[in-house]
Amino acid sequence: MSSESSFGLMQIGLATAEDIRGWSYGEVKKPETINYRTLKPEKDGLFCEKIFGPSRDWECYCGKYKRVRFKGIICERCGVEVTRAKVRRERMGHIELAAPVTHIWYFKGVPSRLGYLLDLAPKDLEKVIYFAAYMITSVDTDSRHEELPNLQVEHDIEKKQLVDNRDSDIATIARDLENELARLEGEGAKAADKKKARDSADRQMANVRKRADADIERLEQVWDRFKNLKVADLEGDEGLYRELRDRYGMYFEGSMGAEAIKKRLENFDMQAESDLLRDIIANGKGQRKTRALKRLKVVNAFLTTNNSPLGMVLDAVPVIPPELRPMVQLDGGRFATSDLNDLYRRVINRNNRLKRLLDLGAPEIIVNNEKRMLQEAVDSLFDNGRRGRPVTGPGNRPLKSLSDMLKGKQGRFRQNLLGKRVDYSGRSVIVVGPQLKLHQCGLPKQMALELFKPFVMKRLVDLNHAQNIKSAKRMVERYRPQVWDVLEEIITEHPVLLNRAPTLHRLGIQAFEPQLVEGKAIQLHPLVCGAFNADFDGDQMAVHLPLSPEAQAEARILMLSSNNILKPSDGRPVTLPSQDMIIGLYHLTTKRVGSAGEGRIFSSVSEAIMAFDLHELHLNSQVKIRLEGFVPYAGWEAPEGWEPGQTALVQTSLGQVIFNQTLPEDYPWVEAVADKGELSRIVNDLAERYPKVVTAATLDNLKDAGFYWATRSGVTVAISDIEVPAEKPVILAGYEERAAKIQGQYDKGLIDDDERRQELIEIWNKATNEIAQVMRDNLSPMNTINRMVSSGARGNWMQVRQIAGIRGLVANPKGEIIPRPIKSSYREGLSVLEYFIATHGARKGLADTALRTANSGYLTRRLVDVSQDVIVREEDCGTERGLVTPIAVADANGELVLDENVENSAYARTLAVDVVDSKGKVLAAGGTDCGDVVIAELFAAGITEVKVRSVLTCESSVGTCALCYGRSLATGKTVDIGEAVGIIAAQSIGEPGTQLTMRTFHTGGAVSASGGDDITQGLPRIQELFEARTPKGVAPIAEAAGRIAIEESERQMRLVITPDDGSEEIAYPVLRRSRLLIEDGQHVAVGQKLINGPVDPKQVLRIMGPRAAQKFLVDEVQGVYRSQGIGIHDKHVEVIVRQMLRRVTVIESGESDLLPGELAERSRFEDANRRVVSEGKTPASGRPELMGITKASLATESWLSAASFQETTRVLTQAAMEGKSDPLLGLKENVIIGKLIPAGTGLPRYTEVTVEPTEEAKANLFTGPSAFSDFSYDTLGGDGAPEFHAIPLDDYDLGSDFR
């Protein structure tokens, strides 16, 4: 099955100038794009046909060669190869740079890889690269050492000369002054003139001294600099550098810009540097050691790969193919072009100008400026805006550089590689199709015809309705009658996929068998709305067509809606009757006392139905009916002598009989009222005990009965159904009094504001509850609103309370509860003030929903990313470890009751060891799937806890094994090998996240009686846990077992533990207002929480170890979801938590090839240690690391997966430097490169199957007569000839396509 083009690794590396020239088909020398007159590409320009290939198929530039027959010829006139135009999508060019430039990713990225390698601060590196400082690239230390005495002598002589010159100049001036003064004396000049002469001479002397001292100082400076000169020294003073070079240029070399970096890299000794750094790490400490560790990572990357560090400095820039940066003509004759063309043009312009300046021999300062501009042009081409101000286009918009083409949601990875638009798909509005079966959907005729067009056309030709494809196409476009018949034939048993966005879990795409319908809307079965979260208020759905037989088979077997009855998150049914169906079935099965025909006895069901039709009998009257094939329910009292299979006279109602007729014949009789809970129990039971076909058929029966009887029930809502309780004013008056009393206490200063608020909130919550209760008691059982809520069809009591009772307390925009309630109900109408404060909460609810939906979607994306490579890879990893899970707990009276969370903990797991009762009898063997039945048996036998296999203890090196994962909740059977359990886990956690976010919406911001937690604790808390962040107001946990003492001071409290083992005391400073969970002198256990508040999972890991940290995270996450009434199975959370603890931080590397401080995959760490120990060397030591899901996703072994997730440029920079290979084990990597994903049927164990004949078959192959054995040819004719008959072809089933 494996194709020739398949490959198992994808490596990324640093490209050198040679590589770039090797990829290139020619050098781009001109900045021109196309000729605006002829609209043809300019020669040697950015779209040149000679370099990138012809712009028209099989046609050269000058037109000498046209047509495919000249394929492969290179035109001697224009130099263009005659080939397909699509080569312009793959052929690259290059620009030869006149001066090297550094790659901005390696110099400006954080951390700066170049800086780490050369041990330079990024600031200094920037000075060198952008021509602000010179860098010494080499020093001839030997000759300098030899010559130093001579140079010292020369220096001293020069210095002495300068001193002598200065002294002689000063002496000359002094002499001249004396002469001048003598002359003035002789002339009898005034004292002022003499002073003037003296001052002038003093000034001259001072100038001479100053100049000479400066020269001497400069000489000293140059000499000192030269004496101590070493490689990598920077010199920002150009004058000083020039002098240094003029005097001592033969002993050192220095330069500016990328050339300096290049020279350094050429002479860089990686091995020596690595040894030096390892030495520092072994013996150093503090800052120095940390920096050495970081530098060693970079040095090691170049040492262990074939990458050359010279790849970080470019001598040539690749030019990507022109079709990837197109230029298109708009309607007005103007051109729209990709930003890359502008950026390339700037590079070429500056490069050409630099070449010209170099040819002209321009002054160094001008050349350097041009080189700096070239560097900046290449920087903005690679990553515009990374350094300095971004280059902008028209309208001050920053241009999109090569990096921007990869980054973000619109980048290459997420837009084109991970998400593609597909052919054979369509979308339309959905409407309800109550007449459909569960596995069907209604497909509009026109849509179906368009989707199946190629198939219809081929079939028309096969059936001779059309001569060729062209005429068949014409027939289809004209909607000829034969077309519909053919379409009908083609779509039978050809499933289609329906998808509704947002696809939050795998049930968002399901397969259906299409039924052609009139109109333009897709018809959807009402029972699958829950899975799609669809309603019919204008939702749209997309249709996709599985084409290959394999795809159709998968759609039919795995994705058909009747095979997706269970929810993957908790294994409970998702296709439940809802709304109208519930009302119908509730109406059918309600008991009504005193109605027509009560107490009568009927000989058969048909007789009862006849009585009902004649209005002699009410649907809900209690009567006795003789039933055939009655399967008794628990608690039915059988008459004497009755045996199963006989008819039975049963006390029931006609509605109950009709309801039971919808269930399978051998299903126990259901006497309960069919409300939402009962229906859920029935469907759950059906899914657990019956084949899927039966379950699907039963669901359809329930749907049909539900809709029919909902119509017959005539349930409506009128304003008169809303009955406000008459006792309301009295109740309110009583609570008003109590509230006034509290307010009075506050006014007197007896209580503070916080206490007043708490008390008032408590009072009004009680009032609200009391009114709600009175209101419920007042509603008659036949009140339609009561029936809707009681049956679970729609709405809840909180909403009814707001309509008919009291609106209650509401929150303000900050989320604080306002301690004055809204006393009116909506039936009575709100006052202006009440209406105003009510709108706050409602508006906040809507705003929150919008914000938190985005957050939840992002959480799902991160969860998928971290767990996408968790696939079931093997049957059994062979571990003996597991988790101990409770199945029963003692209640207040000491009696055993089923643990409330057993459905999401022990259920659907594999038992790790035999479960044995107190007498030693094995109740369930290890390896048994722990379903509802097993749990019930164990509970009956008094077992309180079981040890089950878990993903957390699985020892598979990649992915997980089937037994540790247990039952697949979506199918109810043990998970298949190849199941992508990681993605299912992420979807199961993320999908309710979105529901959580939307929960505030329906209640209009009213506060539930429990003072309900809004999901503001919910979603942010889930994110905090999965990102392993330290929460706000963190509570310390005891690091050792011992006695605790509480020491109080003015500002804070200190909790001091004296450990039992006699080690030194441990103190925890906490705020004075903290609520303590311990008392002075109490004994605390390791890991015990000391004050009220959230615990930091990293502390749990450090103090109590990985197992405790895993359990803590699972329990906390489940706590948030359960508080919102959402059930997710523990195993999903465990899959994610396992991914968070997959890595180990290496502390000491021992003699392994791991680096200290490195984050290593646990399996790699253990393999390395095993190898080292087997050679008798010292293994590495490490500590388990808890990583948040974002960090874990970015730290994955697969660079393709990490780059397509976040921080694309950073990931690619690092991966290229390390020469990383992607083993293509996860799903994302394979989607990106377009390979079949290694999950499900894409696993090698399914695709790479070879069939070998058995020894027996091989033996049989050669036992027949050979060509050389004595074979009598006479048997073919003559007397004894066997008779040959012609067999009519119709006897063979050669399939419909044979003719």
From Swiss-Prot:
Binds 1 Mg(2+) ion per subunit. Binds 2 Zn(2+) ions per subunit. It catalyses: RNA(n) + a ribonucleoside 5'-triphosphate = RNA(n+1) + diphosphate. Keywords: DNA-directed RNA polymerase, Magnesium, Metal-binding, Nucleotidyltransferase, Transcription, Transferase, Zinc. Zn(2+) 2 binds at residues 877, 954, 961, 964. Zn(2+) 1 binds at residues 60, 62, 75, 78. Its cofactor is Mg(2+); Zn(2+). InterPro entries: DNA-dir_RpoC_beta_prime (IPR045867), DNA-dir_RpoC_beta_prime_bact (IPR012754), RNA_pol_asu (IPR000722), RNA_pol_N (IPR006592), RNA_pol_Rpb1_1 (IPR007080), RNA_pol_Rpb1_3 (IPR007066), RNA_pol_Rpb1_3_sf (IPR042102), RNA_pol_Rpb1_4 (IPR007083). Mg(2+) binds at residues 535, 537, 539. GO terms for biological process: DNA-templated transcription. GO terms for cellular component: DNA-directed RNA polymerase complex. One of its GO terms (molecular function) is zinc ion binding. Its EC number is 2.7.7.6. The RNAP catalytic core consists of 2 alpha, 1 beta, 1 beta' and 1 omega subunit. When a sigma factor is associated with the core the holoenzyme is formed, which can initiate transcription. DNA-dependent RNA polymerase catalyzes the transcription of DNA into RNA using the four ribonucleoside triphosphates as substrates. NCBIfam families: PRK14906.1, rpoC_TIGR. Belongs to the RNA polymerase beta' chain family. This is DNA-directed RNA polymerase subunit beta'. It comes from Arthrobacter sp. (strain FB24). The gene is rpoC.
